[in-house]
Amino acid sequence: GLLLPVWWFGLRRHGLGWSSVGFRPFNMVRGLVLGCAAWALAMTGTVIWSLVLSLFNLRTQPNMLPLFGGGIGGLVAALLAGGLVGPFAEEVFFRGYLFAGMRQHLSLKWALLLNGLIFALIHILPTSYPPIFLLGVLFAGLLELTGSLWPAIFVHSFINSLSFLLLYVGERLAL
């Protein structure tokens, strides 16, 4: 659903190619270094926020794994939907389309902050707003620093996939 407005209003309407939303080559070493740094910052922020929430007996997000079914089939479905398709679509829309449009009208600082805010708010759960805001800023920063959407897609996909894998392993160890 997120890719349709990008294609219809952005690409088709203006006769643009997918490179205009960030599908461009990038320096692999730079992308890897910046991607690892973004991941480390994201994990640090998430851990700190989780510790703050634990003081109030709250969690950042509910366990989404049961929504995909049980067992290994549920894990595979979660990895496909939440680890590949979701991050791809979200990055194309929020960074490739929305952030790129913001950069035409706003300073880098305001475009990063507004993109992070919109990305957080769309995820609905208030206890998850701070870490998701941080992710939105970091993913937009990756696009800005590498000139390509691919590093943000890879890091986003890695974070979501790792989360599902850890939930799955955690459930198995708790049995």
Q: What does each model-identified segment do?
A:
Residues 95-106, 164-170:
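Membrane-interfacial alpha-helical segments at the cytosolic side of multi-pass membrane proteins
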Residues 1-2, 72, 76, 80, ...:
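Membrane-embedded alpha-helical segments of multi-pass membrane proteins
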